[in-house]
Amino acid sequence: MPMRPHFHCKAALLALAIASLAGCASTPAEPVPFKEVPQARIVQPGYTEPGTGLVAVDVRRERSRDVIVRFRDALVYVDGEQVTDLMNGEHVVFYLSPGVHRIGVSTQFDPVVEMRFTVTADTRYTNRASVTFDGDHGIALRRVAQ
């Protein structure tokens, strides 16, 4: 049976190749910080300027590898006014008075998704919202817990 030793040789070479490739496995990359939205894309600058008595609210567009949504801009609204748009991996900080505000997002394909957002200086709560896309590529907005 001359074929049997040849088979064992191939199996040994395959095992050696797999073992050597497993040693080269990459480690996950460190998380990349969110980029700030350029000033040129802020259409209502009053919401992005700090002031006395105002509380910082961070709205972040989570990164997506999905090509369908990756290059879509997400329009961001505060109390019904469009303030800016967020691209993949960007964030914007709004300075809002304490109380209830409406934060909304949309794309050219989605209607405005809005949420009531209670802004508070109380450090037990986070003033951060996250913009994501669901499995059907629809835009979503949620408050992020601390």
Where are these regions (language model features)?
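Short loop/turn and low-complexity linker motifs enriched in small/turn-promoting residues
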Residues: 2-5, 24-146
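Sec-dependent signal peptide recognition
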Residues: 7-14
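C-terminal motif of bacterial Sec signal peptides marking the signal peptidase cleavage site
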Residues: 19-23
